[in-house]
Amino acid sequence: MTLPQPVRLYDQPRAPNPRRVNIFLAEKGIEIERVNIDLMAGEHKEPDYLAKIGVAQVPALELDDGAIVTESVAICRYFEALRPEPNMMGREVMEQVIIENWQRLVEFRLFATVAACFRHTNPHLAALEDQCPDWGEVNRGRLDGRLGELDRRLEGRDWIAADRLTIADITALVAVEFLRIIKHPIPDGYANLLTWLERMRARPSTAL
């Protein structure tokens, strides 16, 4: 089956979900036209954007058949099919299963926890969405445990889900690096996590 071709990516490079896609594309060496969307100015909520994209979020990928893809992992899945190597989502079925398992664990247990803390405790976001500061602090209280889960997974391993970098590592990196924004340090003693983080930061694709 011939895949539709990418037209442009609606982007905000420093936002977590777009950054996942941007790292993924950089690892694959894929260049694409980008349209930078100013979230703080509310450009993602403008009528023209909503009419085209359908939801007030980034990233969003426009394809030449008119399709719009708005979920970051789905965008990565498309580009994995378009350019299978270097492979980051699994070649054989069981490898795909393990990678997706860890991608979802990292996304729902760590990435989402960091995001909830940020979205509900950062005063600059109050104009963009309803906040519940208590819920933000509940999630902050979960972070050390979630980071500990990742540290244990990395015992004796270079990468989270396979023998190479995968989308699970990309999701984890974006979550861990966002800890700086919410002023939450990595606890002492998480040596496996810190070694992995140094390895990830050494990759050109992850440069901010």
Model regions: which residues?
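Short beta-strand edge/turn micro-motifs at domain boundaries
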Residues: 25, 205-206
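GST-like domain detector, emphasizing the conserved glutathione-binding G-site
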Residues: 1-133, 137
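GST-like fold's C-terminal all-alpha helical module
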Residues: 2, 103-204
